[in-house]
Amino acid sequence: MQGMSYPNALAFELSCATGWRIGDVLSLRTSQLCEEMTITEQKTGKTSKKRVPYALFCRLREQAGEEWVFPSRRAGKHRTRQAVWADVRRAARLVGLETHVSPHTARKIFAVEDCRKNGLAHTQHELNHRDSAVTALYAFSDTIIPDYKLNELAGIIAEIVIDKLAKK
């Protein structure tokens, strides 16, 4: 499937599932990998604990390298935000999304879904935002990018994951 590599699609999926920034996702060490993961956010220094869906956890465990969950081709390094960004942009263009789409869009997808299910205050807590106005920008970002386009992007990412699983 053109657009995204499997590891980058998996990183985007983990960001969608947890609301974690892509930099935090990519810097996960294999030793941190469990169904309920705790990270210290690079940007804020705050702790975030999330339960990862079991099927996603299994795919992450399969994907993980010796040191990093998302290893780079360069020894001892993890994948970069820039590599994921390029893949996300390619996938967005495939579905005709010309608005700004980046790995951070995964965090917004998380916010939209979480706010619909649990309300703005819960989403603010989940994203570790100090200001609810910032959370509102994330949670209502689907009014800026239409749902059907976000669903198409999510579909492309799901296809990549399914293709990879089918080839095993």
Where are these regions (language model features)?
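Basic, Lys/Arg- and aromatic-enriched nucleic-acid-binding interface segment
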Residues: M1-I22
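Short, basic (Lys/Arg/His-rich) helix/loop patches that form interaction surfaces
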Residues: Q2-N8, A86-H125
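The alpha-helix within a helix-turn-helix
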Residues: S15, L26, Q124
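Conserved tyrosine-mediated DNA breakage-rejoining catalytic core shared by Y-recombinases
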Residues: S27-C58
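Short, polar N-cap/turn motifs at the start of nucleic acid-interacting alpha helices
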Residues: T30-E36, G119-A139
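Catalytic-site neighborhood detector that most strongly recognizes the C-terminal catalytic loop/helix
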Residues: E41-G45, L127-E152
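DNA/chromatin major-groove-contacting recognition/catalytic segments
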Residues: R51, A55, F140-K168
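Active-site/catalytic core of tyrosine-dependent DNA strand-transfer enzymes
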Residues: Y54-E98
